[in-house]
Amino acid sequence: LRNYARLIARSGINVVKGQEVIIRTEPEQTDFVELLAEECYLAGAGKVTADWRFLPLTRLDIQYQSPETLGGVEKWQEERLRHNAETLPAMIYLDSDDPDGLDGTDQEKWAAAQQARYKITRPYRDAMENKYQWCVAAVPGKKWAKKVFPALSGHEAEEKLWELILR
């Protein structure tokens, strides 16, 4: 795992000395995030931040928030986007979501909310386009692993998926 974290930090995003790094991930990945953050620092990062995303909360947001709230962008979120557009941190997206995590939610409501948010966030995303380093890396989560290896226990499925990723 250490080698994988090093590969992401040094080749995936190619950290520049003093650069800020943001790791977008699920809370299930705390152990790997710790390894990855350390490898980013060893590669020269000036600051490493974890941006936690929790799919069960997203599911509840879709279910209970009004379309206006769900499609809105808070002032602090917009300020963070502005900061990112100005400072161009390296972004690491750790993909480990439950493939079925949003099943049964109102997909039309979710799509409309994402479109509304995009109208607000687009100028910041456009400002970053082709100007910052980013990397998407797979990190097995239990539900994803169980989807791939349903006959195995959660832990065994996760270990097996790690084996395939690290080949």
Give the location of each predicted region.
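Active-site bordering "gate/hinge" segments
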Residues: 1-167
